[in-house]
């Protein structure tokens, strides 16, 4: 959905996980996988992320859609991304793409390409609620807008992003 919007609207789609993987790979000789990132030091990776993003931001002429997570589910306790990390990204708005917990459970069950902690529908619903609270907090503390869009709602996503970009 985000990739399609970015291509149609001529905006850059920057994925947090890919930025971190590329930055770590530049420092290391071995390839970095999504699983390496999930199991690695999440908060340490945020410094790598913000440094890498600053380089992209300085050279990218198009508006940027930064595609990342506010909560990283790594095991016992999900890790929340601090507002200071979000502040360094200088967003003009935050759009939370969410889905019903039952749908997330189904998608995770069918996605054998990576390991994830096993979560019940109730646990995922709690995480989704926490994501809403985090994004609301980001918006309030940074003085930016916050919108929510259901996964797959391409027109809703386009409308939210267009408002933030002023297009």
Residue ranges and their predicted role:
Residues 32-35, 87-134:
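A glycine- and Lys/Arg-enriched "phosphate-lid" helix/loop adjacent to the NTP-binding pocket
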Residues 62-63, 132-167:
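NTP-dependent small-molecule kinase module
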Residues 9, 89-90, 142:
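Short, structured coil segments at secondary-structure junctions
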Residues 26, 76-77, 106-108, 159:
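Short, well-ordered secondary-structure micro-motifs
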Residues 11, 60-62, 92:
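Short coil/turn segments at beta-strand junctions that form active-site/ligand-binding loops
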Residues 16-79:
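ATP-dependent small-molecule kinase phosphotransfer cores
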Residues 11-13, 94-96, 146-148:
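Conserved beta-strand scaffold positions in the cores of enzyme catalytic domains, especially
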Residues 1-6:
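Glycine-rich phosphate-binding P-loop
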């Amino acid at each position: 959905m985000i990739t399609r919007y970015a291509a149609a609207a001529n905006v850059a789609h920057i994925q947090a996980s890919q930025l971190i993987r590329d930055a770590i790979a530049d420092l290391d000789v071995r390839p970095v996988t999504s699983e390496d990132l999930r199991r690695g030091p999440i908060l340490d990776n945020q410094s790598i992320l913000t440094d890498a993003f600053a380089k992209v931001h300085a050279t990218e002429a198009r508006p940027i859609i930064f595609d990342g997570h506010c909560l990283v589910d790594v095991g016992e306790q999900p890790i929340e991304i601090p507002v200071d990390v979000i502040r360094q990204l200088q967003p003009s708005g935050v759009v939370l793409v969410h889905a019903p917990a039952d749908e997330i459970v189904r998608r995770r069950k069918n996605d054998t390409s990576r390991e994830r902690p096993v979560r019940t529908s109730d646990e995922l619903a709690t995480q989704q609620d926490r994501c809403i609270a985090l994004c609301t907090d980001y918006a309030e503390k940074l003085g930016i807008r916050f919108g929510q869009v259901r996964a797959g709602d391409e027109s809703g996503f386009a409308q939210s992003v267009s408002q933030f970009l002023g297009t």
